[in-house]
């Protein structure tokens, strides 16, 4: 069985991440504006709170992130197709997008 090619352009240098929800492909990016919008919608008190909510299996956080962090693809179709089985892939994609902000940063030892 061959793996299906992702049909949308993904700019990894910009921190974009491919995500397939059901059969709907979207590209997400953790832009500062998007993160601020998700944080505001979820009433997060800190970046740590936002990260925990996006990393977990929480319906409101997952739906908000799909809506507000999608930079390419049909976010409305992705939200409509969303099922519980998609939450792990979503959490993994959100974590990967967030990690872009920390890549190349010196470590605090």
Language model features: what each stretch is:
Residues 2-14, 32-109:
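Short, surface-exposed, charged amphipathic helix/loop patches that serve as local interaction elements
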């Amino acid at each position: 069985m061959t793996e299906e090619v992702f049909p949308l352009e993904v700019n990894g240098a910009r921190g974009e991440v491919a995500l397939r929800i059901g059969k709907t492909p979207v590209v997400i990016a953790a832009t500062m504006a998007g993160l601020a919008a998700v944080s505001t919608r979820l009433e997060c008190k800190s970046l740590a709170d936002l990260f925990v909510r996006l990393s977990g299996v929480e319906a409101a956080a997952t739906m908000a992130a799909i809506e507000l962090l999608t930079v390419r693809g049909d976010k409305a179709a992705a939200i409509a197709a969303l099922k519980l089985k998609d939450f792990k892939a979503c959490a993994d994609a959100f974590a990967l997008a967030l990690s872009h902000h920390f890549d190349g940063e010196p470590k605090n030892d």
